Amino acid sequence: MSNIITFDPSSPFPHRDCFFPLKGIYLNAGVQHPVSRGSAEAAYDYIKYKGFHTDHDYNPIVMRKEVIGKFAKLINAEPNELTYVGSTTAGENLIIQALELIKNGGQVVTDDLHYFGSYQIYGELKKQGIEVITIRHKNGNIDYAEYEAAITDKTTLVAVSSVSTFNGHQHDLKRLCDIAHKHGALVYADSIHHIGATPFDVKDSGVDFISCGTFKWLMADQGLGFLYVRSDVLPKLNRPWYGKRQVRNLVTHVFPGDQIANDDQVYEYDLEESTEGYFSVWSEPRIVIAQLNYSLSYILETGVERITEYRQPMLKILRTEIEALGLKCQTPPDSITPLLTFACNNANKRLAPLLDKAGIKLSIYRDHFRLALSVYNDMDDAKRLIDSLKQLD
């Protein structure tokens, strides 16, 4: 095995040397975070192992457990409360199926700052008879009095993004969970824009479920995510599907050497009472797990609190200077998350050519744009964006 590229996480920011040279100014980690040099090398080591052509001490089964342990440490969860899923949205769908909402009925309360890819989930549930209440944001923020009014004893699930992909709004999950739990409702949080970027503690929040993909602030690739289910919630759920990872104590009556007493009993088994025992069925993309083995160590050793603190001066100057240009910020003023969103009429037509020329990459939509700051950005990046926006007609 090759030596994984080492980088001292305690070194001063920006951590540009941790990554490959970036083309221009990259302010788009909210879409896809760059993979670090060490993460790429970890993936390459896994590929070499898959060649089975050299001596190695690679153990992907051990690595799988180690990565679950690292993610558990990152969010203050127990490892048995976690499993792998295919994506954030896959995890959200599994929770809905495990609650058997369509079969049992119920009410879902959500808001319009939830991930737009989840709109159709609740739209389709509504078509099938589930009452769905969607709270509208006001100036990029959520009024919890509206959640207080909407959540009742009829409510089964509250579904939100703990940090909104639209504008970086961060929910007060503890407050929301207190409101929901008072009525017996459970809370799901899409946390793909939260974990790894801003401190997150599942125990402190009281959240029942989270799902988090790995290609944004966890600094790996697509095709994998983590699902968290609070251990005391499991008895309220039904397994949405079945597979070998859910099984323990499997005894077969099929193969040579097995005891075959009768034709009816082909196998015996017990089911694991854990998040994996409810939701895991398949082999995951191990190459992404290999990346995570490096990137999660980097995040843990660097410290999410330190990452959060580093970007605050950049966020402040960007908000102040860009708003001074007449572009209204859509992100709540007290936000500490890495995302800033600004309204901009005809942004696709007016802004895209300007930023392309300046070599600046961020997310541009019809009438707004969003930037995302990470550990490799610095104040010069912020100032170059501001200078470019001053040329906007």
Task: Go through each PLM region and give its residues.
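Pyridoxal 5′-phosphate
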Residues: 1-393
